[in-house]
């Protein structure tokens, strides 16, 4: 009986929130697209009057020297940068606090999130802490609790999976409780994003496949969700086709820029779709397992049924 009442409440909440979403700011990111487009980003940043940025990434990408061309271009145009590379596969509250402190201590004026969904989630939450210094990360969890514009935010995905470059969410792990919770607010949606397939050509096949299935999960759950619209259904269909038509080629021939570019676009469209239409049970299970075991959400989507926890 209690569960039935909860279900009714959840459905009412979804219906009310679906109506409320019509009145929110859903401005999409301004995109830089195509091979080599990341090198256009520094001049674009400079044109916004920004002279110093915090680059949020992880040690793995730093060790691959994937950011070196971006760093060189930033130096050429006169934009200073500092690097936070402590992002973990499931960013934690301490990660976010360290990142926020580095931004403030170095008087940065903007944030570049460079990497997968973890880097972008960490950067989003850190940006929220910058503009809301008196509000803890735990207090931001849930719906619409930030409601203040982040510093200028530039998202550069290096995987075609999470779609975080266009979503309003940041998923955070609490190391004390091992829970994963989302901070959801339209102000977390990046204003600018770069879809550069050259940044994904070095992904090993197993990451190409798992992140691609993450994007496909977004598209399917957005398509069948209770809060979908004509627009999200169209975006989900486009995303599904792009992923189906290109994931095998991207897996077998990682240097195929067309396939890589189409996967990035599919991930982006899936991110747009589920931002409006929500995700579903697969994500709910995967986020809980990720909090318990520290597994990346893209991998957990495929393996949830094999774990003892469920």
Regions found by a protein language model. Give the residues of each.
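An N-terminal, well-structured beta->alpha segment
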Residues: 1-79, 83-84
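N-terminal small/polar loop signature for handling phosphorylated ligands or for N-terminal nucleophile
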Residues: 62-134, 249-260
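Active-site nucleophile and cofactor-binding loops and adjacent substrate-binding regions
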Residues: 88, 114-116, 278-279, 296-298
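Glycine/threonine-rich beta-strand-loop-alpha-helix active-site module
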Residues: 94-101, 105-195
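Carboxylate- and glycine-rich phosphate/diphosphate-binding segment that chelates Mg2+/Mn2+
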Residues: 169-277
């Amino acid at each position: 009986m209690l569960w039935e009442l909860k279900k009714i409440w959840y459905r009412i909440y979804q219906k009310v929130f679906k109506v409320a979403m019509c009145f929110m700011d859903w401005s999409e990111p301004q995109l830089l697209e195509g091979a080599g487009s990341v090198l256009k980003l520094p001049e674009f940043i400079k044109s916004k009057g920004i002279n110093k940025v915090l680059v949020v990434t992880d040690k793995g990408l730093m060790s691959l020297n994937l950011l070196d061309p971006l760093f060189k271009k930033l130096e050429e145009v006169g934009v200073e940068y500092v690097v936070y590379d402590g992002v973990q596969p499931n960013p934690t509250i301490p990660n976010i606090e360290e990142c926020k402190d580095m931004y403030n201590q170095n008087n940065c004026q903007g944030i570049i999130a460079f990497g997968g969904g973890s880097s972008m989630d960490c950067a989003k939450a850190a940006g929220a802490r910058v503009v809301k210094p008196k509000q803890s990360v735990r207090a931001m969890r849930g719906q619409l609790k930030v409601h203040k514009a982040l510093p200028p935010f530039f998202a550069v995905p290096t995987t075609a999976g999470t779609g975080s470059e266009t979503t309003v969410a940041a998923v955070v792990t609490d190391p004390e409780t091992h829970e994963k919770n989302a901070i959801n607010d339209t102000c977390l949606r990046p204003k600018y994003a770069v879809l550069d397939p050259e940044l994904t050509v070095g992904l090993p096949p197993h990451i190409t496949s798992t992140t691609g299935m993450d994007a496909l999960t977004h598209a399917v759950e957005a398509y069948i969700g209770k809060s979908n619209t004509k627009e999200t259904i169209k975006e989900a269909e486009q995303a599904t086709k792009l992923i189906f038509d290109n994931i095998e080629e991207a897996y077998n021939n990682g240097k195929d820029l067309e396939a890589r570019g189409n996967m990035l676009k599919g991930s982006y469209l899936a991110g747009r779709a589920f931002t409006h239409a929500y995700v579903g049970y697969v994500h709910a299970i995967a986020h809980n397992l990720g909090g318990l075991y520290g597994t990346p959400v893209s991998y957990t989507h495929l393996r949830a049924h094999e774990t003892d926890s469920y």
